[in-house]
């Protein structure tokens, strides 16, 4: 029998509900329970695939091709359980499915309403495919009181009423702000947030109180009294030195124990040795490297959330601190002096994915710098494409090389993928098609050349990686690019789609069409990030 933990947020957004859900799931998992985490997103987009990175942050892609919220990345990294399409739902998808059914006549003439049709769809989502689980943690996006979130709150209220009393637990994440002028933590915002939640029919069982100062016992007692919870169920959640220290901190404050107490369960103490190990690696590095990330969305680091974490994983694997220098690609279009000034201090250069023409000449310039100066280079998605364009222009003699994504070109070294094979059959796309849900998404196999650098890094010649792209390096240019020094060391199984390029005449120069950062985990750092940081460590010793 699955038990459900519903996680809501109050007072303000960005309190860390996703990290809290991931940390609690990791603690329950460490006690021997089977867990899965799900995310309810109240926005009306069908998925975040067409949303601006500045609005939404990173789009996290699952093995089965779902474009989801970045919180699912936290879920995977903390639990090691691969997320699926079935773990993320949006209001947009719910309404689309309901309207499709209504047009088809599935409701037999009934009036379609928020209650019961929308709330039933939410409840069905929460309970789907849970037979083999002990705990299902459901995070509700946004803040209690948001208009778009009301159907989700109502659905959870109904679900609590329909399930056995020992099957549900409500955890409310709230803010206890510190007022410096008064020198006090204020509990009133938490009281009002809980009052709003109870007004919607839900009494929280546990309060997780985010605060920047330790929560005094007197304030915990006050919150417990006014919010109608046990004092032991008021859990302080102070800022942590690293997100990977959060599970240890929550365990020390008794969060997982309080959850088990609520459900009337007993379990062995959690084995947290591996969490203690990675926190030790993070807090006590034996060296330091600086990585320059030349991107388009550097004003919002959430746009590169998994990338940032994967670099940290590579650092922990090599016992070094990774300092990330976020560099706006457009600045590199001003000339060589600016490029040299920004990139010379770097021990490694990474060009991540992105869409559109803006900043691409700056990315190409940074690739050239890395190639000529023999600085470790890692290109991901658009970064690989720009590495191929740079190689075409400067080492293969194809002066007008470009991408059709940026406009008409006589030398389309990069072009739109018109068709590719999936498990279901042949997928086809056209230049003028819809943007949403039409990319090459999810996990695909690649075959690696046996004597290549990447095969040595992976320790295998067959790999599976997650993709999210509409454009691809044009295989018709493969022979000319290889004459210029680029080696196509990874291809799709049919040999038509380039997946990896590298330069044998360079200490560490690799471009990949996929997104390896999506599969990196703190306990299993992705081999490419582990290798990239190792190369940066060697570079740091040379300068």
From Swiss-Prot:
Mg(2+) binds at residues 71, 139. Belongs to the CTP synthase family. Its EC number is 6.3.4.2. It holds the Pfam family CTP_synth_N. L-glutamine binds at residues 54, 354, 382-385, 405, 470. It catalyses: UTP + L-glutamine + ATP + H2O = CTP + L-glutamate + ADP + phosphate + 2 H(+); L-glutamine + H2O = L-glutamate + NH4(+); UTP + NH4(+) + ATP = CTP + ADP + phosphate + 2 H(+). CTPSs have evolved a hybrid strategy for distinguishing between UTP and CTP. The overlapping regions of the product feedback inhibitory and substrate sites recognize a common feature in both compounds, the triphosphate moiety. To differentiate isosteric substrate and product pyrimidine rings, an additional pocket far from the expected kinase/ligase catalytic site, specifically recognizes the cytosine and ribose portions of the product inhibitor. It comes from Novosphingobium aromaticivorans (strain ATCC 700278 / DSM 12444 / CCUG 56034 / CIP 105152 / NBRC 16084 / F199). GO terms for biological process: 'de novo' CTP biosynthetic process; pyrimidine nucleobase biosynthetic process. Catalyzes the ATP-dependent amination of UTP to CTP with either L-glutamine or ammonia as the source of nitrogen. Regulates intracellular CTP levels through interactions with the four ribonucleotide triphosphates. InterPro entries: Class_I_gatase-like, CTP_synthase, CTP_synthase_N, GATASE, GATase1_CTP_Synthase, P-loop_NTPase. Transmembrane segments: none annotated. The keyword Ligase applies. Homotetramer. Gene3D superfamilies: 3.40.50.880, P-loop containing nucleotide triphosphate hydrolases. GO terms for molecular function: ATP binding; CTP synthase activity; glutaminase activity; identical protein binding; metal ion binding. Allosterically activated by GTP, when glutamine is the substrate; GTP has no effect on the reaction when ammonia is the substrate. The allosteric effector GTP functions by stabilizing the protein conformation that binds the tetrahedral intermediate(s) formed during glutamine hydrolysis. Inhibited by the product CTP, via allosteric rather than competitive inhibition. The active site is at 381 (nucleophile), 515, 517. Residues 1-265 are annotated as: Amidoligase domain. Keywords: ATP-binding, Glutamine amidotransferase, Ligase, Magnesium, Metal-binding, Nucleotide-binding, Pyrimidine biosynthesis. It comes from the Bacteria. This is CTP synthase.
């Amino acid at each position: 029998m699955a038990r459900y933990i519903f996680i809501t947020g109050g007072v303000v957004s960005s309190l860390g509900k996703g990290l809290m859900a991931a940390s609690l799931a990791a603690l329950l998992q460490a006690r021997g329970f089977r867990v899965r985490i799900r995310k309810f997103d109240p926005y009306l987009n069908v998925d975040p695939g067409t949303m601006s990175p500045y609005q939404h942050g990173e789009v996290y892609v699952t093995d089965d091709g779902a474009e989801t919220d970045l919180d699912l990345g936290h879920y995977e990294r903390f639990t090691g359980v691969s997320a699926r399409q079935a773990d993320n739902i949006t209001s947009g998808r719910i309404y689309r499915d309901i309207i499709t059914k209504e047009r088809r006549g599935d409701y037999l003439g009934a009036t379609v309403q928020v209650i019961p049709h929308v709330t039933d769809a939410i409840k069905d989502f929460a309970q789907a495919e849970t037979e083999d689980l002990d705990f299902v943690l459901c995070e509700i996006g946004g803040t209690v009181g948001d208009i778009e979130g009301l159907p989700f709150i109502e659905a959870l209220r109904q679900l609590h009423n329909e399930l056995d009393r020992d099957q549900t637990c409500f955890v409310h994440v709230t803010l206890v702000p510190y007022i410096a002028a008064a020198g006090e933590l204020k509990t009133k915002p938490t009281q009002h947030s809980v009052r709003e939640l109870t007004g919607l029919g839900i009494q929280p069982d546990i309060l997780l109180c985010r605060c920047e100062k330790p929560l005094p016992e007197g304030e915990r007692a006050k919150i417990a009294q006014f919010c109608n919870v046990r004092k032991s169920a008021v859990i302080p959640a102070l800022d942590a030195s690293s997100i990977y220290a959060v599970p240890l901190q929550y365990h020390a404050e008794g969060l997982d124990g309080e959850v088990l107490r609520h459900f009337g369960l007993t379990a062995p103490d959690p084995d947290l040795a591996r969490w203690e190990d990675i926190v030790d690696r993070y807090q006590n590095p034996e060296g330091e490297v600086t990585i320059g990330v030349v991107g388009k969305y550097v004003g919002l680091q959430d746009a590169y959330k998994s990338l940032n974490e994967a670099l940290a994983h590579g650092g922990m694997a090599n016992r070094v601190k990774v300092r990330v220098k976020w560099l706006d690609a457009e600045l590199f279009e001003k000339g060589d002096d600016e490029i040299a000034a920004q990139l010379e201090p770097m021990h490694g250069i990474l060009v991540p994915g992105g869409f559109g023409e803006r900043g691409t000449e700056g990315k190409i310039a940074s690739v050239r710098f890395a190639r000529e100066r023999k600085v470790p280079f890692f290109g991901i998605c658009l970064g690989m494409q720009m590495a191929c364009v740079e190689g075409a222009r400067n080492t293969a003699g194809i002066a007008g090389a470009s991408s059709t994504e940026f406009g008409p070109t006589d030398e389309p070294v990069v072009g739109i993928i018109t068709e590719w094979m999936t498990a279901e059959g042949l997928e086809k796309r056209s230049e003028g098609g819809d943007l949403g849900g039409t990319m090459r998404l999810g996990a695909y196999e690649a075959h690696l050349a046996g004597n290549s650098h990447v095969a040595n890094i992976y320790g295998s010649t067959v790999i599976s990686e997650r993709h999210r792209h509409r454009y691809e390096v044009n295989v018709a240019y493969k022979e000319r690019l290889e004459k210029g020094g680029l080696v196509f060391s990874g291809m799709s199984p049919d040999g038509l789609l380039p997946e990896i390029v590298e330069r044998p005449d360079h200490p560490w120069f690799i471009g990949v069409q996929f997104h390896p950062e999506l599969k990196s985990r703190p306990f299993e750092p992705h081999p490419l990030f582990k290798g990239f940081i190792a190369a940066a460590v060697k570079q740091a010793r040379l300068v």
